């Protein structure tokens, strides 16, 4: 049993209230297994795999590396090439996966099918109204992305300090806090704000087991909290990415006005982002990173990272916070 017992740890059968959510091109077997073995809830990213058959093989590979629970992320976003979502969903179910994280567009049909097969569903969203809809659809938990997060933070620009308690005030299902988390201070803050766990992405990029080029990890460690850009705001498809030559070029095109997706499609191509992670040239394409870069200056193993987060959180609660109580 872990130090912290929450609705999240109880619902998903993990030791710590820490999740490694979906990360395109990164959520592979070695990453997920390392987090699972460390006691967190890990996910493979379905669309990192080129086909449903490849996803099934990756699930099998992950099971060779861990005997602990892990899930699969299925992101539902507009793509240049149609995605066979039903086939990916079937591969997840047939593989016996018990936890799925959905994100993006309306997950209704997928939630119903997953639940019919006994799969627990976490839906990641960026607004309380979306979380309430997911709850009505029957999800087992929601992951709430604050404005600080990497990837797609939505269009409302509400930071986690407000978004989390606003969600906790209205939701009944467990809440996972996403965006800006890297250490025990964040875990304690999230729990105090009403969350049941934290989700980390950028922090897991800078771990020993993360299957990306060392130069990308070094760039994260060297960055500060200002080293991100918000691109595609003019298209209402905002993405927070690491600031580089490509993100600046995209912003320049948007600033001229009247730009459509076709004007930036080649620059924001997912394949170029994949090459960044593989080749280590951080100016080669767009890649996701959150403001939390400013809190990252090391590259621990996942087991060390989770151990240190939980221990720091325990000490904060036992020593700092209890010590502030005036004789209560």
Swiss-Prot record:
<dbReference type="GO" id="GO:0050136">
    <property type="term" value="F:NADH:ubiquinone reductase (non-electrogenic) activity"/>
</dbReference>
<feature type="binding site">
    <location>
        <position position="124"/>
    </location>
    <ligand>
        <name>FMN</name>
    </ligand>
</feature>
<keyword id="KW-0288">FMN</keyword>
<keyword id="KW-0520">NAD</keyword>
<dbReference type="GO" id="GO:0018580">
    <property type="term" value="F:nitronate monooxygenase activity"/>
</dbReference>
<dbReference type="GO" id="GO:0000166">
    <property type="term" value="F:nucleotide binding"/>
</dbReference>
<feature type="binding site">
    <location>
        <position position="75"/>
    </location>
    <ligand>
        <name>FMN</name>
    </ligand>
</feature>
<keyword id="KW-0285">Flavoprotein</keyword>
<dbReference type="Pfam" id="PF03060">
    <property type="entry name" value="NMO"/>
</dbReference>
<keyword id="KW-0547">Nucleotide-binding</keyword>
<protein>
    <recommendedName>
        <fullName>NADH:quinone reductase</fullName>
        <ecNumber>1.6.5.9</ecNumber>
    </recommendedName>
</protein>
<comment type="subunit">
    <text>Monomer.</text>
</comment>
<feature type="binding site">
    <location>
        <begin position="178"/>
        <end position="180"/>
    </location>
    <ligand>
        <name>FMN</name>
    </ligand>
</feature>
<comment type="similarity">
    <text>Belongs to the nitronate monooxygenase family.</text>
</comment>
<dbReference type="InterPro" id="IPR004136">
    <property type="entry name" value="NMO"/>
</dbReference>
<feature type="binding site">
    <location>
        <begin position="201"/>
        <end position="202"/>
    </location>
    <ligand>
        <name>FMN</name>
    </ligand>
</feature>
<keyword id="KW-0560">Oxidoreductase</keyword>
<feature type="binding site">
    <location>
        <begin position="22"/>
        <end position="24"/>
    </location>
    <ligand>
        <name>FMN</name>
    </ligand>
</feature>
<dbReference type="InterPro" id="IPR013785">
    <property type="entry name" value="Aldolase_TIM"/>
</dbReference>
<comment type="function">
    <text>Catalyzes the NADH-dependent reduction of a broad spectrum of quinone substrates, generating the corresponding hydroquinones. Highly prefers NADH to NADPH as a reducing substrate. Also displays a small NADH oxidase activity. Does not exhibit nitronate monooxygenase activity; is inactive against propionate 3-nitronate, 3-nitropropionate, nitroethane, 1-nitropropane, 2-nitropropane, and the anionic forms ethylnitronate, propyl-1-nitronate, and propyl-2-nitronate. Has no azoreductase activity since it is not able to reduce the azo dye methyl red with NADH.</text>
</comment>
<dbReference type="GO" id="GO:0016491">
    <property type="term" value="F:oxidoreductase activity"/>
</dbReference>
<feature type="binding site">
    <location>
        <position position="150"/>
    </location>
    <ligand>
        <name>FMN</name>
    </ligand>
</feature>
């Amino acid at each position: 049993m872990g130090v912290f017992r929450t609705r999240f740890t109880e619902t998903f059968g993990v030791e710590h209230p820490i999740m490694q959510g979906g990360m395109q091109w990164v959520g592979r077997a070695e990453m997920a297994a390392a987090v699972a073995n460390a006691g967190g809830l890990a996910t493979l990213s379905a669309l990192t795999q080129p086909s449903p058959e490849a996803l099934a093989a990756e699930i099998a590979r992950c099971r060779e590396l861990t005997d602990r629970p892990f899930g699969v992320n299925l992101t539902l976003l507009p793509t240049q090439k149609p995605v066979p979502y039903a086939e990916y969903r079937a591969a997840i179910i047939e593989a016996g996966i018990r936890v799925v994280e959905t994100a993006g567009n309306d997950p209704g049909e997928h939630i119903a099918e997953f639940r019919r097969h006994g799969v627990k569903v976490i839906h990641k969203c960026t607004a309380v109204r979306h979380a309430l809809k997911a709850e009505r659809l029957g999800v087992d938990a929601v992951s709430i992305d604050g404005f600080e997060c990497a990837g797609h933070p939505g269009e409302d620009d509400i930071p986690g300090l407000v978004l989390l308690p606003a969600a906790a005030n209205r939701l009944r299902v467990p809440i996972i806090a996403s965006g800006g988390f890297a250490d025990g201070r964040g875990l304690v803050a999230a729990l105090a704000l009403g969350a049941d766990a934290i989700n980390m992405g950028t922090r897991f990029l800078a771990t020993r087991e993360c299957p990306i080029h060392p130069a990308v990890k070094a760039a994260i460690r060297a960055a500060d909290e200002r080293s991100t850009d918000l691109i595609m705001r003019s298209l209402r498809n905002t993405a927070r990415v690491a600031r580089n030559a490509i993100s600046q070029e995209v912003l320049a095109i948007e600033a001229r006005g009247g730009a459509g997706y076709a004007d930036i499609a080649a620059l924001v191509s997912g394949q170029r982002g994949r090459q960044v992670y593989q080749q280590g040239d951080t100016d080669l394409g767009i890649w996701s990173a959150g403001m939390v870069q400013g809190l990252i200056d090391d590259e621990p193993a996942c087991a060390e990272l989770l151990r240190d987060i939980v221990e720091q959180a325990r000490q904060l609660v036992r020593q700092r916070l209890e010590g502030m109580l005036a004789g209560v």
